[in-house]
Design a protein with these regions (language model features):
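A short glycine-rich, Lys/Arg-flanked "PGG" loop and its adjoining helix->strand segment in the class I
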Residues: 100-112
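Conserved SAM-binding loop of SAM-dependent methyltransferases across substrates and taxa
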Residues: 25-36
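Conserved SAM/SAH-binding beta-strand->alpha-helix loop
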Residues: 45-47
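Conserved SAM-binding motif I beta-strand of class I
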Residues: 38-43
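A C-terminal cap/extension of S-adenosyl-L-methionine-dependent methyltransferases
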Residues: 160-240
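Conserved class I S-adenosyl-L-methionine
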Residues: 117-148
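A conserved beta-strand element that flanks and buttresses the S-adenosyl-L-methionine
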Residues: 86
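Conserved SAM-binding loop
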Residues: 52
Length: 240
């Protein structure tokens, strides 16, 4: 899906440079490697980077994978300028006080004609708190639970047996939660420009997960500030 969408803005062909920040096991970069793009992935998880390297080696594709916190990764260490930077399910995890810093740092790696793709769930959508990572079936399937007051949310997670690391991660996500309005304001604050936006009622990734056909949010809902956050399971942006 990335390829079809991004080709509207950049010709995806052999030799262009692609960077994914928060690349995980490298799955998002594989379609670009298949088209002989130069792909680079960075992730702060050493285990995920090892998995990405093994995955690409197994399939016989070239890819460069770097274990580092992106904030610690200097553009002086990487002389490449990237035609496309992918940032999917990352910005909503960044502390609110560092989001603008993150955006500005990402732009340092962008070529003059390059674009940044952003994908994130609107904070107020039913599972915007990523509570699906909970081990307990009730917590993982309960929509909007992340919107409860902090003390109540913490108590529920504890009562239903979530471990300390899971609770900590979920509370960090709650503290960093990102709405559509907030994202657009920090893009503006970082002197960025929004080239395109798609708000999804049914996330394209749900097609593979749940066999659901992707559906865009109705234009009338997309235009209603704040309310649209409750219905946007994924937000796609192209910025410069």
């Amino acid at each position: 899906f990335y390829i079809d969408y991004l080709e509207k803005f950049v010709a995806i062909k052999r030799g262009i440079n692609i960077l994914e920040i928060g690349c995980g096991e490298g799955g998002n970069l594989l379609p670009f490697a298949e088209k002989e793009c130069n792909v680079t992935g960075i992730d702060r998880s050493e285990e995920r980077i090892s998995q990405a390297i093994s995955y690409f080696n197994l399939l016989g594709f070239n890819g460069r994978f770097i274990h580092s916190d992106f904030f610690d990764f200097s553009s002086e260490e990487d002389m490449n300028k990237y035609d496309i930077i992918l940032i999917h399910d990352v910005i909503e995890h960044i502390d609110k006080c560092r989001k603008v810093e993150f955006i500005l740092h990402a732009k340092e790696f962008l070529s003059e004609t390059g674009i940044i793709f952003w994908g994130f769930p609107a904070w107020q959508m039913p599972f915007g708190g990523h509570q699906q990572i909970c081990r307990n079936g009730f917590c993982s399937k309960m929509p909007f639970i992340h919107l409860l007051p902090l003390s109540v949310y913490n108590k529920i997670l504890f009562i239903f047996g979530e471990n300390d690391s899971c609770i900590k991660e979920l509370l960090n996500i709650k503290a960093a939660g990102l709405s559509i309005e907030h994202f657009e304001s920090i893009i503006k604050e970082s002197n960025g420009r929004i080239v395109d936006r798609i708000l999804w009622f049914i996330n394209p990734h749900y097609k593979q997960k749940f066999k659901l056909k992707p559906r865009k949010l109705m234009p009338i809902l997309s235009s209603i500030r704040y309310i649209r956050n409750y219905f946007s399971t994924s937000c796609f942006y192209i910025t410069k």
